[in-house]
A protein has these predicted regions:
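Short, compositionally biased P/S/T/A/G/V-rich stretches that sit at domain boundaries
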Residues: 1-41, 122-123, 127, 176-187
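Generic structural hydrophobic/aromatic packing signal, biased to beta-strands
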Residues: 9-13, 48, 66, 140-142, ...
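Intrinsically disordered, low-complexity segments enriched in small/polar residues
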Residues: 14, 18, 61, 81, ...
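Extracellular adhesion/glycan-binding regions together with long Ser/Thr-
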Residues: 32-37, 90-139
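Low-complexity, serine/threonine/proline/glycine-rich extracellular segments that form mucin-like
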Residues: 36-93
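Ser/Thr/Pro-rich, low-complexity mucin-like regions
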Residues: 51-61, 126-181
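Enriched for extracellular/lumenal, surface-exposed ectodomains of secreted and cell-surface proteins
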Residues: 69-74, 82, 105-112, 157-169
Length: 187
């Protein structure tokens, strides 16, 4: 039986090239910053990068999307508007410092048997993960915008586009909303 596992994640600043944007914990290397939760301001943008690995048997191709939740709520697909959520996709607007949707991903988390993934910024840019053979991995990178009150926790993970969860989540991205920084500058 084919098994899909989200094995690792990396939370990255939204600004910068696909491969060159710094981890939010910028003083750490990608390897040391992976799978670490972060504390962010009540209004923040962040890139959620994750690696999905196939095992057991060759997987079938599937559409993929980022799903997030506030605190213990159910996971909801991140779309271009907030609706009732505290998160949304960044959007497709012209932002020269953030790669556009479907920009191919490099290998920041994957060290072997990697297939090319994609950057996702808006809901109109769908991406289909090709069939993964046993041991193959893919990296996906999605830019989200969060507006939430201090004390809120936002978790994000990749699921199939139709809402079906992957088989296993070894690590799930976690962002904890803090009080605004002194001086109101966000630093």
């Amino acid at each position: 039986t084919a098994v899909l596992t989200q094995t690792d994640y990396l939370l990255v600043y939204p600004i910068g090239t696909e491969a060159g944007a710094l981890p939010v914990k910028y003083w750490l290397t990608d390897t040391n910053a992976k799978n670490l939760s972060i504390h962010i301001q009540p209004t923040s943008s962040v890139r959620v990068r994750a690696m999905i690995t196939g095992s057991g048997a060759t997987t079938s191709p599937f559409g993929v999307a980022l799903y997030c939740r506030k605190d213990a709520d159910s996971y909801t697909k991140a779309v271009d508007s907030f609706g009732a959520n505290v998160f949304r996709l960044y959007g497709a607007g012209a932002t020269p410092d953030i790669p556009s949707s479907l920009t191919p991903t490099s290998n920041r988390l994957c060290s072997a048997s990697c297939v090319v993934g994609a950057m996702l910024r808006d809901q109109s840019s769908s991406f289909t993960v090709q069939a993964l053979t046993i041991g193959q991995s893919i990296e996906l990178d999605t830019v989200i915008y969060i507006i939430a009150s201090p004390g809120v926790t936002v978790n994000c993970r990749y699921q199939k586009d139709d809402g079906t969860a992957l088989n296993v989540y070894t690590n799930t991205a976690t962002m904890i909303i803090d009080e605004p920084a002194a001086g109101g500058m966000g630093f």
